[in-house]
Amino acid sequence: MSKKADTYDKYTVELRNNKVDKQADGVATGYFTDEYMGWRASNFTAGYISTAKLIVDGVVKDRWTELKRFVALLKDGGNVNVWYHYDLTKIPETSGEIPIEKPTVIDFKRAVTLTVGKQQIVNKKELTVKGIGKMTASDYIFMNEQGATLTVEGGTFTATKATDANGVVIYNQGICNIKNGTFDGPGFTLMNTGSADMTIENGNVINRNSPTGYALMAAGGGTKLTVKGGRIEAIQSIGGANVTISGGTILNDCKYYALYNQNGKTTITGGYFSGYPGMKDVYIADGTVAIQGGYFEDNQTAAADGYVYKDNVQTVDGITYNYEVVAQ
């Protein structure tokens, strides 16, 4: 076993006239071998090769067996436990599109990282992601198609760069339920278009100094967004989207407003709102925003009919909110 990256290319173990008599009682071969006991194919998942090259009777044993096995499990559906680091972009055989066409659960059993390609995971049916692991891609970790359901119960999800000014973690056109997790991207971290229906109950949606200025976008008349909790670094509602906010913290620490509404239909009944210094908490370019509750730094955007801003200073996580909107 070695942590040196050149171990596989530098050293070779060759077995000639080798034959396995029988499996040893009580000893599992594991996922890293075929019928040859004691050989760990590789530890490519941790960023280095852990064994020498193995040649058995003139045949070089495949060091990517575990990576291929994992991809096959994803394609087959069902419960897929993640115990190890994986990078699906390492070889052509594992870097193609993976359609989720059966109910599938990706369950991170350890704090490990699954690296996927841009738009590689395409959910067409029902996908649940849970556990303490991490997923990363250059862009578009999850494509959630119309008619599909994506549920995220926990984990950390990072898009590393914006290839088209998006930097998307989830591109949603179906049903998406976010119960918890951290979502980090350099653009519209969570993007909802078409017939998207996203509900956020908790979690942290980060806008990493993006040129867009907003971590969460809802666009189009068929799009529905419901925010019940969590921390979201700014929301953009455009093109007739229907947005309901009843809780959570909505802030813009990048450059613009906590909520930008352009031809959207937004209702606010709760939550905490904080725009970038010098910018409004809520900006209405067009469309409607009915403010019927919540806490705000400023009172520059009119409350809904029958509601008023009341002085109620609160400091939460270092941000001071000066007003609460209440019924008259």
What are these regions (language model features)?
Residues 22, 27, 136-137, 159, ...:
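Residues in short coils/turns that link rungs of repeat/solenoid architectures in beta-rich domains
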Residues 9-13, 18, 42, 78, ...:
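The right-handed parallel beta-helix/beta-solenoid scaffold, focusing on the short coil/turn
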Residues 49-51, 108, 132:
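Short, hydrophobic/proline-enriched secondary-structure or compact coil segments at domain edges
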Residues 29, 142, 165, 258, ...:
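Short linear loop/turn motifs
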Residues 2-81, 270-278, 286-328:
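Extracellular/surface-exposed low-complexity segments
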Residues 53-119, 125, 326-328:
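N-terminal segments that cap or nucleate solenoid repeat domains
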